[in-house]
């Protein structure tokens, strides 16, 4: 399970600056989903091989009578969702009554919490530690979030109890090569014993629970149904047609008589963790509402994680032909960026079309974890360049030399060449589409990474055989005799 870290504290103590530094800004996947997250912002980050989910809160304010429950609501929810709480305080402002209130709340919740003394620039660290020691949460960790000072120490302390990622190759490490002439293979992953892990995600009230219960119908073999904590999703291994799957339910599996709730509880943390743990994501939408902005935000989660994707338009029954045509046009217009994903029109309540989801799940998973030999990927690259060469950069043309597989789920193709940093986005899309078409990839995003530098074979010397050595000597002797004859004639 991916750990969750919450940043809490008074307003203006540097939480957002810290959030942006840890997520590198562009890694933040969602911010301020109206009506769902309000003052909380979620992002993914990674430090020394450990992935984690980061929650930024809007701030907690308090007075001598206690914390303002309305203003602190989202921050308190973030504390409940978190495995670790980083309690930011302002070292310049010193220890305040609001800090005391927050510290008391954290002690009562018995959460793993660390005081982080931010804005430590030009301030004695020992004095800062001493000032915040009365909170009883241990020594404060001195940092300067704006300049990155002390960040490594803070993360080392916060994440030391959590293991490193196991399902992703280290940066720069190639996946195992496939022998020349050998067929493409599936890459076995850590989830093999439980089969394909499927995450069911979507906005509240689109029918996720109904779909989960339909997929776990009487003709399925449910191995067990063991819920985790209130924050955890439910992992349910089951079998269908002798194929193993593990369903990750973010809404919670309910008995058939209890699935008709007005509003499902929505948790961004559950969604992020489910996507991170899954091999394939089934994204559920309400066909009657069409594509809304919240759908696009949630799709961004799956794309950022690079997971294989299947889209299910639920509540398709009961719609008129005109309404269905309009929805299809909207899908084509607004979901063009996930045109690689299969779209199914289903009714989870009645079971219409649900069985077809499994074939798309299988196809998407196979595309996401298949590996190909370097020779195959390089040949596709050469054919693509031959058909449509990269553009000129000044008086020189970009040269793409060879390609190899750099990772899976999603497939990562690493292309080596010269001036690769100048490859335009349009040409990257052309290469992505070419690889997708030739390799017949469905349901998975594909990523291309460029690497420049020298030829890796430069400096290698060929070792001549004895026959080649003797031939070389004869040729050199012949040339010497010919040169001598020309000189004698002069």
UniProtKB/Swiss-Prot annotation:
GO terms for biological process: ribosome biogenesis. Residues 370-454 form the KH-like domain. Residues 3-166, 196-369 form the EngA-type G domain. Residues 470-490 have a biased composition (Basic residues). GO terms for molecular function: GTP binding; ribosome binding. It holds the Pfam family MMR_HSR1. Residues 452-490 are annotated as: Disordered. Associates with the 50S ribosomal subunit. Belongs to the TRAFAC class TrmE-Era-EngA-EngB-Septin-like GTPase superfamily. EngA (Der) GTPase family. GTPase that plays an essential role in the late steps of ribosome biogenesis. This is GTPase Der. It comes from Pseudomonas syringae pv. syringae (strain B728a).
């Amino acid at each position: 399970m991916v750990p969750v870290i919450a940043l809490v504290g008074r307003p203006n103590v540097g939480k957002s600056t810290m959030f942006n530094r840890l997520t590198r800004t562009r890694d933040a996947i969602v911010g301020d989903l109206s009506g769902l997250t309000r003052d909380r912002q979620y992002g993914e980050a990674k430090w020394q091989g450990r992935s984690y989910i980061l929650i930024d809160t809007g701030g907690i304010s308090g007075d001598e009578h206690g914390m303002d429950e309305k203003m602190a609501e989202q921050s308190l929810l973030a504390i409940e969702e978190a495995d670790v709480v980083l309690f930011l305080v302002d070292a310049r402002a010193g220890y305040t009554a609001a800090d005391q209130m927050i510290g008391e709340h954290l002690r009562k919740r018995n959460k793993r919490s660390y005081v982080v003394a931010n804005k430590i620039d030009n301030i004695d660290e020992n004095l800062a530690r001493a000032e915040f020691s009365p909170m009883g949460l241990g020594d404060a960790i001195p940092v300067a979030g704006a300049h990155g000072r002390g960040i490594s120490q803070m993360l080392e302390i916060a994440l030391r109890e959590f293991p490193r990622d196991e399902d992703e190759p280290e940066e720069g490490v190639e996946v195992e090569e496939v022998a020349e002439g050998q067929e493409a293979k599936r890459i076995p992953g850590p989830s093999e014993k439980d089969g394909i892990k499927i995450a069911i995600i979507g906005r509240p009230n689109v029918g996720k629970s109904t779909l989960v219960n339909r997929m776990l119908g009487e003709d399925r073999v449910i191995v067990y149904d063991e819920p985790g904590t209130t924050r955890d999703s439910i992992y349910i291994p089951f079998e269908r047609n002798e194929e193993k799957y593990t369903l990750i339910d973010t809404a919670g599996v309910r008995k058939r008589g209890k699935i008709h709730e007005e509003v499902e509880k929505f948790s961004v943390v559950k969604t992020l963790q489910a996507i991170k743990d899954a091999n394939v994501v089934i994204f559920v939408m309400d066909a009657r509402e069409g594509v809304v902005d919240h759908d696009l935000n949630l799709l961004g989660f799956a794309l950022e994680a690079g997971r294989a994707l299947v889209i299910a338009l639920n509540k398709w029954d009961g719609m008129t032909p005109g309404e269905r045509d309009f929805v299809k046009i909207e899908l084509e217009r607004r979901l063009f960026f996930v045109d690689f994903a299969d779209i199914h029109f289903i009714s989870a309540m009645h079971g219409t079309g649900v069985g077809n989801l499994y074939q798309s799940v299988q196809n998407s998973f196979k595309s996401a974890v298949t590996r190909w030999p370097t020779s195959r990927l390089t040949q596709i690259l050469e054919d693509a360049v031959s058909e449509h060469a990269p553009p000129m950069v000044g008086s020189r043309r970009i040269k793409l030399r060879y390609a190899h597989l750099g990772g899976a789920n999603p497939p990562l193709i690493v292309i080596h060449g010269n001036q690769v940093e100048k490859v335009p986005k349009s040409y990257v899309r052309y290469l992505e589409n070419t690889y997708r078409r030739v390799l017949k990839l469905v349901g998975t995003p594909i990523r291309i990474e460029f690497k420049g530098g020298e030829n890796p074979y430069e400096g290698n010397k060929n070792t001549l055989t004895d026959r080649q050595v003797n031939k070389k000597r004869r040729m050199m002797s012949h040339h010497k005799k010919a040169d001598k004859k020309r000189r004698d004639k002069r």
